């Protein structure tokens, strides 16, 4: 499941997806609140979303569609509140009048450095979301 932005919707979608009998990964889209705590786009704390998954049979959670600069803060919360596998696929870019603008995005080399840091923290899966192009993934492949 991608872009889980609120807990209630996540739980409903998780139940439906698990009815397939296939393993279901859950990807959270996050940003810091005014106090700097990592939250889903709904404003619900990431730690609460992780707690809601307890006992639900989810093997992996992803920090996804989240700014590169916010990933480590998200991983701090995940490290404290999650015992399963972890993935990261961050985004880079800006929303301008409802449209993505990819001027001044992170360079492929800098994304690879960030990805290596996430891998060093123990994540299991790394990729890219909006604004992360094949060139970025090519650089990441060199540091895996």
How does the language model describe each region?
Residues 1-144:
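Domain-level signal for soluble alpha/beta catalytic cores
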């Amino acid at each position: 499941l991608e872009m889980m932005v609120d807990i209630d919707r996540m739980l409903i979608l998780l139940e439906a997806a698990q009815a397939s009998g296939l393993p279901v990964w859950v990807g959270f889209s996050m940003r810091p609140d005014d106090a700097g705590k990592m939250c889903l786009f709904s404003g619900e704390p990431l730690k609460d979303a992780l707690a809601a998954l307890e006992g639900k049979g989810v093997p992996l959670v992803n920090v996804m569609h989240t700014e590169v600069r916010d990933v480590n803060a998200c991983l701090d919360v995940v490290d404290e509140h999650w015992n399963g596998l972890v993935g990261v696929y961050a985004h880079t870019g800006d929303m301008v009048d409802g449209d993505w603008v990819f001027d001044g995005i992170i360079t492929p080399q800098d994304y690879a450095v960030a990805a290596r840091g996430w891998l060093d923290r123990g994540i299991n899966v790394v990729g890219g979301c909006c604004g992360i192009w094949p060139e970025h993934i090519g650089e990441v492949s060199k540091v895996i």
